[in-house]
Swiss-Prot record:
Pathway membership: Cofactor biosynthesis; ubiquinone biosynthesis
Keyword Thylakoid: no
Gene Ontology MF, one: 4-hydroxybenzoate polyprenyltransferase activity
Positions in coiled-coil regions: none
Keywords: Cell inner membrane, Cell membrane, Magnesium, Membrane, Transferase, Transmembrane, Transmembrane helix, Ubiquinone biosynthesis
Protein name: 4-hydroxybenzoate octaprenyltransferase
The EC number(s) this enzyme carries: 2.5.1.39
Pfam families linked: UbiA
Gene (name only): ubiA
Family in the record: Belongs to the UbiA prenyltransferase family.
Source taxon at top rank: Bacteria
Cofactor requirements of the protein: Mg(2+)
Organism: Azoarcus sp. (strain BH72)
Cellular component, GO annotation: plasma membrane
Record field: transmembrane: 19-39, 43-63, 94-116, 135-155, 160-180, 207-227, 234-254, 269-286
Amino acid sequence: MTLSDRLPLYGRLMRLDKPIGSLLLLWPTLWALWLAADGKPPLHVLVIFTIGTVLMRSAGCVINDYADRDFDGHVERTRNRPLATRAVSTREALALAAGLSALSFVLILPLDPLVIWLSFPALFLAASYPFTKRFFAIPQAYLGIAFGFGIPMGFAAVQGEVPPIAWVMLLANIFWAVAYDTEYAMVDRPDDLKIGIKTSAITFGRFDVAAVMLCYAVALGLLGWVGAQAGRGALYFAGLAVAAGMALYHYTLIRHRERAPCFKAFRHNNWLGAAVFAGLALDYLIG
């Protein structure tokens, strides 16, 4: 098989055909950049973080499939992934993940040295998350740290430091990630129970829907506190109100715990993150 034949396989391994993960990683990064820069992040920083988000999410997907290669064949949604079907070798996957990570590192070299230092725990979080499903009862919380680490890095890039408000925003992202990834885990719960991996959907059990809604409430409450501390105005809080309405819509989708509606709720979180960002950006622009 030629390289041109293999490129589509690598694209699938990187989830280039499924941008939802990159968007869920990008929105909190943009929240941080806008807040840190008072609504005017430097263009080069914005470009670097946007490209870096896609690269690191792609690297994380490759590592995830490497870690889960012996499980994915037993799960309906993942059984046709390239590593599960052996269409791509583990050696190829590791080389691809290393290359993507290296490109991400090169991207941030022009930024503040603190960003470079923070990139090391960010890489560790991205690489280790897939393995937490073997040990942690709620690996989605770990995912929230990994997916939200662009927040302290964004503040470091703009301000040269990471103020307390950035860590509160990261905490909000953790609760948001537990909410949306529990919806995702509800899709795979029957298969995950069979193969013995741990997810929040399994841990929460019959309280899964209530836990998801509580996490949404805490996440939005923390983002409200962040906005108040930063002196944001009505448009920011209008964005949070729209996001809250979307969370209530998710309740109507997940309350019966059916696979397709739960997956729809997960994917719809892109718009929830976008609503928060739109409120923040508009508040700086015309508020």
